[in-house]
Amino acid sequence: MAFPQELAIVIQKEMEKLDLKQVKIISDNITNKYRNESGKNRSLINKEIEALVYSAVRMPATYEAVSSVLDQTKKLYSKECKSLLDVGAGTGAATWAACNYFNIEKIVCLEKEAAMEKIGRKYMREGHRAIQQAE
């Protein structure tokens, strides 16, 4: 399923405020952190600007990966999902994807990185009612 237009627009607006060289440096740093520090119980995204860059660089691919899984799940699982618990929600890619596949009424997002949670909540204000009301 295609990346939501309203989400792409809000990410683009946020990214327009940033310097392209700075985005490249931050993107490279994020990639290195994920390659070298994942699974070591370290904070990988500490600053809001890192969460913004993460959302522009990685969120669309995460959204597509989750969408692919949900597409297969929906084919195999006939029941309608009404609630979602998104553990490690990041900036909300899985939440957005799930809401495009199921009629989600209640969402709880858990994210340990404050910067990721802040950006995710900002983006969720652009979503439909259940996304806007996510806890």
Q: Model segments located where?
A:
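Conserved alpha-helix/loop element of class I SAM-dependent methyltransferases that forms part
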Residues: 60-80
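Conserved SAM/SAH-binding beta-strand->alpha-helix loop
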Residues: 113
